[in-house]
């Protein structure tokens, strides 16, 4: 079912160098999608992206989602039909230390990705991947 849907579809994955993004681009590639990544360079050693040698399998643009010009160029050149948006500043502790960076990346950066998708005209589906941290923690009594 998935294979027939994704086969030959142009799919762009933001956050492709992250843990989830790395696995997603490989899975989409295995399903026959024409996949492109857009992400910062991996910031851990080793990284899943490097360990799986994804740069040899999936063309990836190394850039920041705050860079509107590079985002628009990437969208306009590749013309994705489907976008999986995983790029974010996900670290809670860093968000306390760097709240402006976190807000810019997670809010303005996401807006930039959405706007690039809207303007390029080829996107038919946009999947915004988020985190459990966006929900209020409710303590449940265990019994």
Model regions: which residues?
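N-terminal Rossmann-like NAD(P)+-binding domain of SDR-like oxidoreductases, especially those catalyzing
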Residues: 1-143
């Amino acid at each position: 079912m998935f294979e027939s849907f994704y086969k030959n579809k142009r799919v762009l994955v933001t956050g492709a160098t992250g843990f989830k993004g790395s696995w997603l681009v490989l899975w989409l590639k295995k399903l026959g999608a024409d996949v492109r990544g857009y992400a910062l360079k991996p910031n851990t050693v080793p990284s899943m992206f490097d360990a799986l040698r994804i740069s040899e399998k999936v063309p990836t643009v190394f850039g920041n989602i705050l860079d509107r010009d590079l985002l628009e160029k990437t969208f306009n050149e590749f013309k994705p039909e489907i976008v999986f948006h995983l790029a974010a500043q996900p670290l809670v502790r860093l968000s306390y230390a760097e709240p402006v960076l976190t807000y810019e990346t997670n809010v303005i950066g996401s807006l930039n990705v959405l706007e690039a998708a809207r303007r390029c005209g080829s996107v038919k589906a946009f999947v915004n991947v988020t985190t459990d941290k966006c929900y209020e923690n409710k303590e449940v009594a265990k019994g």
